[in-house]
């Protein structure tokens, strides 16, 4: 393996990845979501997946995992590379962490998620980044220990950074003030929910992310979705949001924290 690259962010499932390997095109088999190209006497193996956010990997297809599977199944690696790719394959085998022995779930947050965001070469070594959103039923130390055991001598786990889940009970006065205000203004009966994303609320000792989101919002042709290009919202929806924020802030001021 001369080159291996994939992904643009640690917290996103990549939709494309490629590896340049010393091999001949003749004899290599086709595979779903894989393309093969001759390149300077070698072969470029490209994987084509489906991208998504690390906090919600359901329905995604990790292109790095596709390339890893093809290299292993085709024998396009040395013995040392094979041991490493076998370790990486365990990561990509399940976004619930089953391949690494870290799968777990709890009531507030649901199941753990884990994805491989980027693959690159550094000083002759392949580096695979990981991003996991884990519930209250485990912690960073437990996850790291399990991963090290799962990969064995095929790979090393380095630069581990963990932040335990942050959770506030849904029936606390502050949360009730926010959700009741939202329902009162919109006429809906929504309930608060947890998510895997580490929002701006992480920067405060006692906070949650709060804001209106409408899945049935009609946008013009040039309007993009949340976090997408040309993100937009109707003016009426923005003005309604202002009303929600003002009322919620006034009610939060009356609560003794």
Please give the residue ranges for each predicted region.
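Midchain, well-structured core segments that form catalytic/ion-binding scaffolds
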Residues: 1-135
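Short, conserved loop/turn and helix-capping segments at secondary-structure boundaries
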Residues: 58-61, 172, 232
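Zn-dependent metallopeptidase/amidohydrolase metal-coordination segment
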Residues: 181, 188-255
């Amino acid at each position: 393996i001369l080159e291996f690259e994939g992904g643009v962010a640690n917290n996103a499932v990549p939709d494309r990845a490629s590896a340049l390997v010393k091999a001949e095109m003749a004899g290599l088999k086709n595979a779903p979501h894989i393309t093969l190209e001759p390149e300077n006497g070698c072969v470029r193996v490209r994987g084509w997946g489906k991208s998504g956010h690390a906090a919600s990997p359901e329905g995604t297809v990790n292109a790095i995992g596709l390339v890893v599977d093809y290299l292993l199944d085709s024998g396009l690696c040395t013995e040392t590379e094979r041991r490493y790719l076998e370790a990486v394959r365990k990561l990509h085998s399940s976004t619930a962490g089953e391949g690494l022995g870290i799968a777990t779930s709890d009531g507030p947050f649901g199941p753990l998620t884990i994805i491989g965001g980027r693959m690159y070469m550094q000083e002759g070594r392949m580096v695979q980044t990981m991003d996991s959103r884990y519930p209250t039923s485990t912690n960073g130390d437990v996850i790291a220990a399990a991963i090290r055991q799962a990969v064995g001598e095929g790979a090393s786990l380095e630069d581990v950074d963990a932040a335990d889940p942050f959770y506030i009970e849904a029936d606390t006065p502050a949360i009730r003030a926010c959700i009741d205000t939202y329902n009162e203004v919109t006429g809906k009966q929504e309930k608060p929910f947890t998510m895997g994303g580490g929002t701006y609320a992480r920067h405060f000792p006692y906070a949650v992310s709060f804001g209106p989101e409408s899945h049935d919002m009609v946008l013009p042709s040039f309007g993009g979705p949340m976090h997408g290009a040309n993100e937009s919202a109707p003016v009426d929806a923005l003005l309604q949001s202002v009303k929600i924020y003002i009322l919620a802030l006034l009610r939060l001021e009356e609560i003794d924290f």
